[in-house]
């Protein structure tokens, strides 16, 4: 089995990133916004892996680990904010967050 060509891997990463960006802009539910952010971060991680494999450098794998670590931190903080938003307003609508003042 051969390696995936650079163009194909970057095209898939670009499509995933665009899908995540569209989901980020269109959705009003904070859970879907978080999922769209995860898709975007995984697309960038895929681009790093594909580029690292193309030039036979371990830098892509190192950046992949960094991106996955950042995605885990973002998910945990985002879910904590989601829970607090739901407890306070009983909705997951992101526009309700504009009412939070403190």
From Swiss-Prot:
<feature type="transmembrane region" description="Helical">
    <location>
        <begin position="30"/>
        <end position="50"/>
    </location>
</feature>
<keyword id="KW-0830">Ubiquinone</keyword>
<dbReference type="InterPro" id="IPR001133">
    <property type="entry name" value="NADH_UbQ_OxRdtase_chain4L/K"/>
</dbReference>
<dbReference type="GO" id="GO:0042773">
    <property type="term" value="P:ATP synthesis coupled electron transport"/>
</dbReference>
<dbReference type="GO" id="GO:0030964">
    <property type="term" value="C:NADH dehydrogenase complex"/>
</dbReference>
<dbReference type="GO" id="GO:0050136">
    <property type="term" value="F:NADH:ubiquinone reductase (non-electrogenic) activity"/>
</dbReference>
<keyword id="KW-0997">Cell inner membrane</keyword>
<comment type="similarity">
    <text>Belongs to the complex I subunit 4L family.</text>
</comment>
<keyword id="KW-1278">Translocase</keyword>
<dbReference type="GO" id="GO:0005886">
    <property type="term" value="C:plasma membrane"/>
</dbReference>
<keyword id="KW-0813">Transport</keyword>
<keyword id="KW-1003">Cell membrane</keyword>
<dbReference type="InterPro" id="IPR039428">
    <property type="entry name" value="NUOK/Mnh_C1-like"/>
</dbReference>
<dbReference type="GO" id="GO:0048038">
    <property type="term" value="F:quinone binding"/>
</dbReference>
<feature type="transmembrane region" description="Helical">
    <location>
        <begin position="6"/>
        <end position="26"/>
    </location>
</feature>
<keyword id="KW-0520">NAD</keyword>
<keyword id="KW-0874">Quinone</keyword>
<keyword id="KW-0812">Transmembrane</keyword>
<comment type="subunit">
    <text>NDH-1 is composed of 13 different subunits. Subunits NuoA, H, J, K, L, M, N constitute the membrane sector of the complex.</text>
</comment>
<keyword id="KW-0472">Membrane</keyword>
<comment type="function">
    <text>NDH-1 shuttles electrons from NADH, via FMN and iron-sulfur (Fe-S) centers, to quinones in the respiratory chain. The immediate electron acceptor for the enzyme in this species is believed to be ubiquinone. Couples the redox reaction to proton translocation (for every two electrons transferred, four hydrogen ions are translocated across the cytoplasmic membrane), and thus conserves the redox energy in a proton gradient.</text>
</comment>
<dbReference type="Pfam" id="PF00420">
    <property type="entry name" value="Oxidored_q2"/>
</dbReference>
<protein>
    <recommendedName>
        <fullName>NADH-quinone oxidoreductase subunit K</fullName>
        <ecNumber>7.1.1.-</ecNumber>
    </recommendedName>
</protein>
<feature type="transmembrane region" description="Helical">
    <location>
        <begin position="62"/>
        <end position="82"/>
    </location>
</feature>
<keyword id="KW-1133">Transmembrane helix</keyword>
């Amino acid at each position: 089995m051969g390696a995936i060509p650079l163009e194909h891997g970057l095209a898939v990463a670009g499509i995933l990133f665009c899908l995540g960006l569209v989901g980020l802009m269109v959705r009003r539910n904070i859970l879907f916004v978080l999922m769209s952010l995860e898709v975007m971060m995984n697309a960038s991680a895929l681009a790093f892996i594909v580029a690292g494999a193309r030039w036979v450098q371990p830098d892509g794998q190192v950046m992949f680990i960094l991106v996955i670590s950042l995605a885990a931190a973002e998910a945990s903080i985002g879910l904590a904010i989601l829970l607090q938003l739901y407890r306070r307003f009983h909705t997951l609508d992101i526009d309700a967050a504009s009412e939070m003042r403190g």
